[in-house]
Amino acid sequence: MDLENKVKKMGLGHEQGFGAPCLKCKEKCEGFELHFWRKICRNCKCGQEEHDVLLSNEEDRKVGKLFEDTKYTTLIAKLKSDGIPMYKRNVMILTNPVAAKKNVSINTVTYEWAPPVHNQALARQYMQMLPKEKQPVAGSEGAQYRKKQLAKQLPAHDQDPSKCHELSPREVKEMEQFVKKYKSEALGVGDVKLPCEMDAQGPKQMYIPGGDRSTPPAAGAMEDKSAEHKSTQYSCYCCKLSMKEGDPAIYAERAGYDKLWHPACFVCSICHELLVDMIYFWKNEKLYCGRHYCDSEKPRCAGCDELIFSNEYTQAEKQSWHLKHFCCFACDGILAGDIYVMVNDKPVCKPCYVKNHAVVCQGCHNAIDPEVQRVTYNNFSWHASTECFLCSCCSKCLIGQKFMPVEGMVFCSVECKKMMS
């Protein structure tokens, strides 16, 4: 029965997003179909984050699971006992303040996520300080950006062994220990504050995933326009520019009370993308997204995108691979000991390369074997042989000789070129 449930669970995972169009390949992709062990589409080879997959409760569960067995556990348990989902992203509808006039229709903006604060004015200002193309307004480019970063920065297979491909019991145990360690030592959630709220003692606040928000509204702070442009004693930990009194700032508990960030500066130190939903990992005085924190701790398989917990793995082309996943990107044939060619940083076996990627010789019109020498000029190639690299007029061998290229033809002299004109 356990095996049956596991197989069913795996099948459901592969059904998620099935048929969703690719935003990158457009009509060239028949629709999203998850590869059996790679985290890509079988049809177009793009990742799930490149497809228009609707966010489901699975994303909420993924983020909620991230906070299990942390200091937030008791709060999560209370939310569950109250009948509230373990995690629910903070969808917020913000009202335009100028719309309060009589006979003026109310103008609202729906965000798919907003910072967990009670004060709408503070949340609105936080959003306005983000680049417009990254503001998660429902149905916008920014919402698509957030969805993509959720998949990229917080992959489920970095926290849940059941989302990985055929881990051994030892690997499962080691992964569980690794996840437990980063939850206790590195994982955190940013909190939106006003600089004036930061005192020597530090705020005694706790982030509640999906429940009531513990950050109190800043009374009168947003109405005091005169304070908005005054510098404070704080400077942004990222850009080093001073923080303004009336502007929201992000505080990260693991970094300490002496560090604040502008909303647009709260980014991963490796990929420099906004930390999605302000979820961060702190290490060596730097912010990381989940993916790049894990990359700094463990090798990642370039085939399946999972972290490697096996004692034996291979390294090739400055990348790491599970032994069973060092395969041809086209046919999935294992490449150990075989000749392969790198195409767009992906290994391809020799037969697949010749079939799908090899350049065609202008002389014999056959594919050029990757191990064979060739002559290339602009976008044209020839076998470097006495049978192929010849004058297009008199058939004189041009290897080691001067030649005159004309589109796909080559000539040994002006005379031969004129004769073919």
Swiss-Prot record:
Gene Ontology annotations of biological process type: negative regulation of cell population proliferation
Annotated region (Disordered), positions in chain: 133-164
The entry's keywords: Cell junction, Cytoplasm, LIM domain, Metal-binding, Repeat, Zinc
GO CC term (a single one): cytoplasm
InterPro entries: LIM1_Testin (IPR034958), LIM2_Testin (IPR034959), LIM3_Testin (IPR034960), PET_domain (IPR010442), PET_testin (IPR033724), Pk/Esn/Tes (IPR047120), Znf_LIM (IPR001781)
Biased amino acid composition, Basic and acidic residues: 155-164
Record-annotated PET domain positions: 92-199
Keyword Zinc: yes
Record domain LIM zinc-binding: where: 234-297, 299-359, 362-421
UniProt record similarity statement: Belongs to the prickle / espinas / testin family.
Function per UniProt: Scaffold protein that may play a role in cell adhesion, cell spreading and in the reorganization of the actin cytoskeleton. Plays a role in the regulation of cell proliferation. May act as a tumor suppressor.
Free-text comment about domains: The N-terminal and the C-terminal halves of the protein can associate with each other, thereby hindering interactions with ZYX.
Self-association state and partner proteins as the record states: Interacts via LIM domain 1 with ZYX. Interacts (via LIM domain 3) with ENAH and VASP. Interacts with ALKBH4, talin, actin, alpha-actinin, GRIP1 and PXN. Interacts (via LIM domain 2) with ACTL7A (via N-terminus). Heterodimer with ACTL7A; the heterodimer interacts with ENAH to form a heterotrimer.
Name of the protein in question: Testin
Gene name in the database record: TES
